[in-house]
Amino acid sequence: MITKAKKAEIITRFGKSEKNTGDISVQIALLPEDIEKLKLHFEKNKKDKHSMRGFIAKVNKRKKLLNYLKEKNFASYKETIEALNIRK
């Protein structure tokens, strides 16, 4: 899980204010840290199928949000993927 301080920092960085938590860029930016922690978990626990389901759900959610952002606001999409170092 993300700490409250880290979460607040991500929200202000991508949402432009503390209260803008529903912005697509903010929602996308909050997912990579959880995904990375789960990757490390699966290196140690290869047979944990229940957590794998949650991991796949998070990856798919990020994928759907990125596709939505790409269709609606391509400039914001480019900024987000460059800031998070995801995709090409």
From Swiss-Prot:
Subunit structure, as described in the record: Part of the 30S ribosomal subunit. Forms a bridge to the 50S subunit in the 70S ribosome, contacting the 23S rRNA.
Q: What is this protein called?
A: Small ribosomal subunit protein uS15
Q: What GO biological process term is on the record, naming one?
A: translation
GO molecular-function terms, A-Z = rRNA binding; structural constituent of ribosome
Keyword ATP-binding in the entry? The reply is no
Q: Which PROSITE patterns match?
A: RIBOSOMAL_S15
Query: Record's PANTHER family?
Result: RIBOSOMAL PROTEIN S15, BACTERIAL AND ORGANELLAR, SMALL RIBOSOMAL SUBUNIT PROTEIN US15M
Cite a GO CC annotation: cytosolic small ribosomal subunit
Q: Which NCBIfam families match?
A: S15_bact
Q: Which keywords appear in this protein's UniProt record, sorted alphabetically?
A: Ribonucleoprotein, Ribosomal protein, RNA-binding, rRNA-binding
The species is: Mesomycoplasma flocculare (Mycoplasma flocculare)
As recorded in UniProt, coiled-coil segments are: none
Please name the SUPFAM superfamilies in this protein's record: S15/NS1 RNA-binding domain (SSF47060)
User: Known Pfam families for this protein?
Assistant: Ribosomal_S15
What role does this protein play? One of the primary rRNA binding proteins, it binds directly to 16S rRNA where it helps nucleate assembly of the platform of the 30S subunit by binding and bridging several RNA helices of the 16S rRNA. Forms an intersubunit bridge (bridge B4) with the 23S rRNA of the 50S subunit in the ribosome.
InterPro entries given in the database record: Ribosomal_uS15, Ribosomal_uS15_bac-type, uS15_NS1_RNA-bd_sf
The family classification in the record reads: Belongs to the universal ribosomal protein uS15 family.
Q: Does the keyword Nucleotide-binding apply?
A: no
